[in-house]
Amino acid sequence: MKYAVRLEQCKRSNYAYQEIRSRHYIPNHGAIGQQLHYLIYLDKEIVGIISGGSAAYAVACRDSFFHINKDNRQIALNGIVDNTVFRLEKNLPNLGTQILAMWRRRVADDWFLKYGVQVAGFETFIIENEHRKGAMYKADNWTFCGETSGSTKLHEHGVIKSSVRLRTEKKLVFCKWIKGRKLPEDYVSSWNLPRGVIKGQLSFL
């Protein structure tokens, strides 16, 4: 069944967005880097939010999936969008999968318009419990790549701050290519921080 859903781009400061974001299982500590946010409408009702942001700097299983290495990392990561937030407050069969597929197509177009880079793929990180196992991503044909280790190092402008190590919960990692797309090889960011690396980016080692 197809539902009458649509996505409306909004600012992160949007009241409705923030209201729903406050109920997401991951605490709202703000967002860094490139990002796009959307309200999810079912008919005329706002039923959720979904967001995309800059890719995490270093994730072993993700890097293997997208063939990312230390030589191409800074440029290649610009072609990956992280599905940072997805909260749906309407429980209908297959609704989440329909929205996820719609978001992939929409954010790829909007990302190019805003940042000037063609999106080649997506990543997401899920803190698993008895209810969260990535079912919507599996239904949308994302690939389960592995788990993070539960340990991160803080990066600033691509340099690991070895004195700073943060403990985090382990996360399931799902990724998806856009068919026929390749990661950028010569992208120069139009954003206002150094190319490809966002201050404060985390790596999941």
Predicted regions, residues:
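Double-stranded DNA-binding cores of transcription factors and transposases
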Residues: 3, 21-25, 34
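Short, charged low-complexity linker/loop segments at the C-terminal edge of domains
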Residues: 179-192
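Hotspots on structured nucleic-acid-binding interfaces, especially in canonical RNA/DNA-binding domains
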Residues: 13-23, 28
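Short, cationic low-complexity segments
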Residues: 190-205
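Acyl-donor binding region in acyl/amide transferases
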Residues: 6-15, 31-36, 42-43, 49-180
